[in-house]
């Protein structure tokens, strides 16, 4: 399903793996493996508009002009800590991508993001920049991360997540209407604690085995 600003990847493999990730009986090892696998599938959609060029190669039969990615034009930015799980799968496909990290945590009282770390690649103005975080809940952390990246020069941005809430999508649309969102599912709502419902719990805790 594709709407303005939002693409929900409803491929059967994506939805099957997401169901396994939602199941509370899935182990930490299983959750981690599924996150890597689903990130490989989501990478296909979020990188759809990567810039291409052509090079001349020799096949076993003849010379030809063949399409290839244009240089090192991709930057991946993980919102720590759970974003790392989504990033790993994309790096398997595009190992030359530049990588950055933004550390944000959500204040449990205000639900507002608090930044504690930032290290991003140079020349973001020349790269497609994909921000990865499994959950787009309130949208506050995502908006803060994109604010930081735009201040650092990023202009061609995408946001990739596993689950999104209607509230988070609307928050992103209001703050950054130029940033497309790619997700595996648009869930029903947020609860009173700012968690996505039905959701899958805390993605970071389930990936790292912490509480």
From Swiss-Prot:
List of residues binding uracil: 196, 201-203
Family from the record: Belongs to the UPRTase family.
Record keywords, A-Z: Allosteric enzyme, Glycosyltransferase, GTP-binding, Magnesium, Nucleotide-binding, Transferase
CC cofactor note: Binds 1 Mg(2+) ion per subunit. The magnesium is bound as Mg-PRPP.
Cofactors required: Mg(2+)
GO MF term set: GTP binding; magnesium ion binding; uracil phosphoribosyltransferase activity
Pathway per the UniProt entry: Pyrimidine metabolism; UMP biosynthesis via salvage pathway; UMP from uracil: step 1/1
Domain of life: Bacteria
Protein name in UniProt: Uracil phosphoribosyltransferase
Residues annotated for 5-phospho-alpha-D-ribose 1-diphosphate binding in this entry: 81, 106, 133-141, 202
Pfam family, one: UPRTase
């Amino acid at each position: 399903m594709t709407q303005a600003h939002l693409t929900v990847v409803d491929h059967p493999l994506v939805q099957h793996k997401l169901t396994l990730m939602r199941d509370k009986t899935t182990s930490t090892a299983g959750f981690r493996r599924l996150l890597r696998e689903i990130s490989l599938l989501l990478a296909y959609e979020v990188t759809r508009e990567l810039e291409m060029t052509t090079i001349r190669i020799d096949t076993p039969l003849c010379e030809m002009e063949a399409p290839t990615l244009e240089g090192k034009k991709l930057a991946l930015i993980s919102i720590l800590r759970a974003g790392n799980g989504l990033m790993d799968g994309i790096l398997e496909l595009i190992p030359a991508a530049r990588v950055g990290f933004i550390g944000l945590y959500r204040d449990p009282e205000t639900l507002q993001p608090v930044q504690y770390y930032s290290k991003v690649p140079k020349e973001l103005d020349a790269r497609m920049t994909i921000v990865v975080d499994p959950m787009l809940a309130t949208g506050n952390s995502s908006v803060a991360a994109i604010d930081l990246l735009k201040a650092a020069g990023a202009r061609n941005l995408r946001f990739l997540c596993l689950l999104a809430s209607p509230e988070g999508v609307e928050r992103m649309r209001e703050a950054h209407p130029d940033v497309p969102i790619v997700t595996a599912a648009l869930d029903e709502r947020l609860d009173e604690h700012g968690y996505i419902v039905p959701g899958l719990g805390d993605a970071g805790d389930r990936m790292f085995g912490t509480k």
